[in-house]
Amino acid sequence: MAPADELKAFQDNQLIVGIMIMLFVGIFTYMAKSLLQVAQAVKVPDEWYMYLRMLIIIMLATLFVGMSTWMVISEETTVESFVMVGLVGDSVDAIQIVTGSFAFFILTVFALKNGAGNVIFRVLIAILGVLAVLDILGLLIADLDLEDSIGFITWILWSLCIVGIGVLGLTTKEA
């Protein structure tokens, strides 16, 4: 079965789509709550904490909108409308990348400035800060066509760092 046929079969099964949407919403909302808890733990000042909350809300909203652009493609979709939905999805994804990158950058700055956590935590949070800058540069430097390669690499490293920080938070009281 071709990948396009597999995606169409997935989208036609409304029960699976509904379950996937609920799982994604739950997981990413929990992640957002955890990011705010990390911000409190690293002592982000109130003004920056307010900015961080706004960025995380926008990041979540655009993430869910971006997911909906590929989960609910109808039978009447034409090539032109599919291309348009793809362009809108790319724009929404760019907003999500920018807001997420700024949120992680704020966390990084205050975690390193305040010396929060142990050395492993500081290294992981510093990597997140570097990845945030790389994601922004990947969007800004469109002529180099680096967005896909940088995005893929940073996506993997984001995941590893966030899992590492989560494990540290569960296993130690310092992180």
Give, region by region, the residue ranges found by the protein language model.
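Hydrophobic, aromatic-enriched alpha-helical segments typical of multi-pass transmembrane helices
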Residues: M1-A175
